[in-house]
Amino acid sequence: MSFASDMKNELTRIDVDEKNARAELSALIRMNGALSLSNQQFVINVQTENATTARRIYSLIKKVFNIEVEILVRKKMKLKKNNIYICRTKVKSREILDELGILKDGVFTHAIDPDMIQDDEMKRSYLRGAFLAGGSVNNPETSSYHLEIFSLYENHSEGLAELMNEYELNAKHLERKKGSIVYLKEAEKISDFLSLIGGYQAMLKFEDVRIVRDMRNSVNRLVNCETANLNKTVSAAMRQVESIQLIDQEIGIENLPERLKEIAKLRVENQDVSLKELGEMVSTGTISKSGVNHRLRKLNELADKIRSGEHIDM
């Protein structure tokens, strides 16, 4: 199963009391429900592609309203593998929609009903229902960090974003072609949201993966930095050796001042060491990195004069 499926499976096993079941069910039916007329009575169909979510809807309706619920299974068309699960209720449809704040004075409302989010537990339950209905989260092992909840109605998405931001999640909403989404892009905020709606095992797995990814990225950055520094050191050393060899051909290293002569010999003999290490090899006593750099720069300047044909005074 995918990371998102594992998470939804975990969320559907959370035990809730009737009050919080009502809040969760309100989100599920508002987002995935449809009303139809059959044999002169209203029928509520709540549709999902996730079998565990279908079982959750079934159990929540039974818990809150204690009525008969059917579960139907449909095959998707056009070679799609997933089944479609439909939870259907044929009685008390008007009462259900009224009590869940989906129907107000005979009119369907798309905004979150304040009665469904009266306290912290109900808010968490509503968000859990919203994620079960329209949520997805990228696998943190293979993708960029991204969690989103799709809703058909923009004002409902705005309400979800406001609700999530009560918990400082930095949620944003965006209009899409057939609806709108609320999304999180920051790994820390995604982790907080998973915990908020009760997905503690998913949160722990997400955090484990995030830590490994962050460590791997840090190591890669360190290796890249050290490689770049090493390449820079090697390039500089090669140029210094070329300059010293040119000086030896044209003037002779033995004719250089003593302080330049020794550092020239040391550099040719130790081409892969750093300036600091080179300074520690000087026979007259350790000299600083800047001191070594100053002497090598003098040698490069002398070689440049030779290359340009300038007169050299020793």
From Swiss-Prot:
Instruction: List the PANTHER family.
Output: CELL DIVISION PROTEIN WHIA-RELATED
Q: Which Pfam families match?
A: HTH_WhiA, LAGLIDADG_WhiA, WhiA_N
- Tell me if Cell division is a UniProt keyword of this record: yes
DNA-binding interval(s): 274-308
Q: What is this protein called?
A: Probable cell division protein WhiA
Please give the family membership noted in the entry. Answer: Belongs to the WhiA family.
Q: Which GO terms describe its molecular function?
A: DNA binding
**Organism whose genome encodes this protein:** Staphylococcus carnosus (strain TM300)
Organism lineage reads as: Bacteria, Bacillati, Bacillota, Bacilli, Bacillales
* Keyword line: Cell cycle, Cell division, DNA-binding
One of its GO biological process terms is: regulation of sporulation
Q: What does this protein do?
A: Involved in cell division and chromosome segregation.
